[in-house]
Design a protein with these regions (language model features):
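Single conserved hydrophobic/aromatic residue that forms the stacking wall/gate
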Residues: 1-8, 12
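Short, conserved glycine- and acidic-residue-centered signature motifs
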Residues: 4, 33, 74, 154, ...
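P-loop NTPase catalytic phosphate-binding loop
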Residues: 9, 51, 100-105, 109, ...
Length: 243
């Protein structure tokens, strides 16, 4: 591959965020939250756990119920009840944060009965995203409190995306790539994509941000990586000469 400045980049117009689909608005029922909080408090009392429910944080897929233990109550008394909590609330899974990082509280995360579909458009059109000026800020999703989460790739030179089948690896990669296409010009960012399965990245073949067509041949993939290493070393040399 050879890095070439595109003549079309002088007139390149970034695509608007409005092209991206946004998720449907779905608010969690306050009555349902109150009922779940009551059931949770009752269960803790039945098991002799003295605790106070201090906050409820509804998110797009799960709701976190935050409790503070009475003096002398061990955290293990709550963590040992995860299966009992799931059974009592008729939910397949419960996640415990014991404690919530940086706080003297325990978080009990329970899946919502109705989950909100989070789309990339929700993230990139948010006020948090529009305030960010660095072109390598990419959208990941919404956190448990429904706040947009973005990541600056310049601060993460090495990223490994892993997970079991259906965990959302491809969706994550597509969100990163789409964020770059929306937020950058072709002369600012060039990408090399390798897709040995030939089914994941073919839709990006015609975008101007690609340095070369999506690579599907393993040998060409090795050649592309070798070029990338050589280009990296060349830039290091330029930086060293400029010091």
């Amino acid at each position: 591959p050879r890095l070439v400045s595109s003549a079309a980049s002088d007139v390149y117009k970034r695509q608007p965020v409005s092209l991206l689909k946004q998720g449907s608005s779905l608010s969690t029922s306050k009555k349902l939250l109150q009922e779940t909080a009551k059931d949770l408090t009752q269960l803790l009392n039945e098991h002799g756990v003295e605790a106070e429910l201090t906050n409820v944080v509804p998110g797009p897929t799960v709701t976190r119920y935050e409790i503070e233990l009475a003096p002398g109550v061990k955290v293990s008394k709550v963590t040992s009840l995860s299966h009992d909590i799931a059974y009592a609330l008729a939910t397949p899974d419960v996640r415990l944060l014991a404690p919530i990082p940086g706080r003297s509280a325990i978080g009990i995360e329970i899946p919502n009965r109705q989950r909100k579909l989070v789309s990339l458009g929700d993230v990139l059109s948010s006020s948090e995203a529009t305030k960010l000026t660095h072109p390598l800020n990419v959208g990941l999703g919404l956190d448990i409190a429904g706040k947009p989460r973005l990541l600056n790739l310049s601060e993460l030179p090495h990223v490994l995306i892993a997970g079991q089948t259906g965990a959302g690896k491809s969706s994550c990669i597509n969100s990163i790539v789409t964020s770059l296409l929306i937020r950058t010009n072709p002369d600012d960012v060039k990408m090399v994509m390798v897709d040995p399965k030939r089914v994941e990245l073919g839709q990006y073949n015609d975008v101007p941000h690609l340095l070369t067509k999506v690579i599907t041949n393993p040998k060409k993939a090795v050649d592309a990586l070798s070029w990338a290493v050589a280009e990296m070393d060349r830039r290091y040399d330029l930086l060293a000469d400029g010091q």
